[in-house]
Every structure is written in C-alpha cells, then in structure tokens.
C-alpha cells in the first residue's frame, strides 16, 4: 500500500512490502490479503477492532466427532456455558487506522 510506504520509515516500508506480496499471493484466489500477525497484535492491544461473541469451545481429542479439531458451539447445542470470547468480525476501518498509527511510529 502506497500510503504505508509513504511513511518512509523502515518498519512501514517492510510492512508495505509484505502487504504487496500478500495482495499478489491472494489475487488469484479471490481472497483479500490476510494479515494474521497484525490481527493477533490488534486483538491484544486494540480490542475495539473486533466484534466478539461468547461460545463454548473445546478441542475434541477422542475422535468421537473430529480428530483434534477445535469445536465451537455457535448454536448452543451442547447446553454448556460459554467459556471463550471468539472474534467473529473485524471493524476494518478501525483496524486499518490502528495499523497505520503503529507503522507511523516505527523507526
């Protein structure tokens, strides 16, 4: 992204290079660029970026339903009390602004 690159610091230029690569990588697959690490950081320090819902979540290791998969009871079928807040949506404008603010400060 040119705006990020224009910040002119090493961190912003590196982030712009990574973003350019991710956009090219996913261009043929119909997906937007995925920014897993930045989103994980935002979840920790900018929770207003996310819309979360409380669900019962468990890892099924017995092979009864799956083999080592994370199971999220989104419909309340287990009757078990929610034990995890799960990020379900991203407020993209808030996330983008947070990321830009962080990158402006990189030296």
Where do the protein language model's features map onto the residues?
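Conformational coupling and interaction surfaces
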Residues: 1-107
């Amino acid at each position: 992204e040119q705006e990020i690159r224009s910040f002119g610091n090493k961190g912003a230029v590196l982030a712009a290079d990574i973003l350019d690569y991710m956009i090219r990588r996913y261009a043929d697959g119909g997906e937007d660029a995925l920014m897993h690490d930045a989103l994980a950081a935002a979840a920790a320090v900018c929770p207003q970026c996310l819309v979360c819902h409380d669900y019962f979540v468990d890892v099924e290791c017995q092979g009864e339903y799956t083999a080592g998969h994370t199971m999220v009871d989104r419909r309340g079928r287990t009757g078990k009390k929610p034990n995890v807040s799960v990020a379900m949506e991203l407020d993209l404008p808030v996330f983008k602004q947070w990321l830009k603010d962080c990158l402006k400060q990189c030296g």
